[in-house]
Amino acid sequence: MTGQPETFAFNDENAEKAKALIAKYPVGWQASAVMPLLDLAQRQNDGWLPKEAMDSVAGLLGMPPIRVYEVATFYTMYNLKPIGKHHVQVCTNLPCWLRGSDAIVGACRKSLGIDFGMTTEDGMFTMSETECLGACVNAPMMQIGDDYYEDLDSDSATAILEKLKSGGAPKPGSQTGRHTCEPAGGLTTLKPSKGGK
């Protein structure tokens, strides 16, 4: 984890990406690029947005800085303080809770030795509670970085975290082998006819 920088500027690669993002919007509507630019700045800055990065985005878009702060503080996808290398976001909203997210939270607490809003002493893991990650049919689930881990139970959640601890890359997606968001027992409709057509 790093401290707050004194200044922020996009590196050469991200400056080109920022120009391309801004160019997607009509003249006069460049402020619409605020969310992707904040994401780009956050990715460049080890997963969090210091005030200087938000100010830089405001300058690029010709927006008052307060408008950028409003966006960054409203959406939970933006982190306003340093986070660990692996940001473990556990969904505890109703569908995940009904399917056992309390067990996932417990497994994460036990495996990582931290609670929501905390970072491990080695700076490797930050744990956050989220309201909804949009994969309700595959509940319970958690997001780590850009990857979704779905159809979890306490054992699979623990296995994912242990693999990350050892430097491995756990397989994202359903942990029960479910294909995307099909019913857990497999397709019940839209099956091929008996003739194979």
What is each PLM-predicted segment?
Residues 1-197:
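Signature of N-terminal electron-transfer/Fe-S-associated modules in redox systems
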